[in-house]
Amino acid sequence: MTTDAFKEYVKTCRALDTEEIHRFMDDMSNEARRITFRLNTAYHTQDEVRGLLSELFGYEVPESLRVFPPFYADFGKNITVGEGVFINACCHFQDHGGVIIGDGCQIGHN
């Protein structure tokens, strides 16, 4: 299964109940944990943070994105961020179904 195929399947609101989907979700969650571990276990400049988040999200994030780690996502590839977004430390995102953060949003820590 591809990331795009998974995103399209999720949009149909059908159950995520096949072996193929479970394997894909496990693989993607493992990848997200590897990337967020690198992000969260050392100091990074904002350019480095954006680079790691681009890897996690699967596209180049806006240069105006600011994130204070630690940052957590269980999937990563279904998060969309707009321009001028700020995400404070310790935010957790469960994004298998999709998370869209619009322009200018500021998200506080939990």
Language model features with spans:
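A structural motif detector for beta-strand N-caps
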Residues: 59, 63-73, 79-91, 99, ...
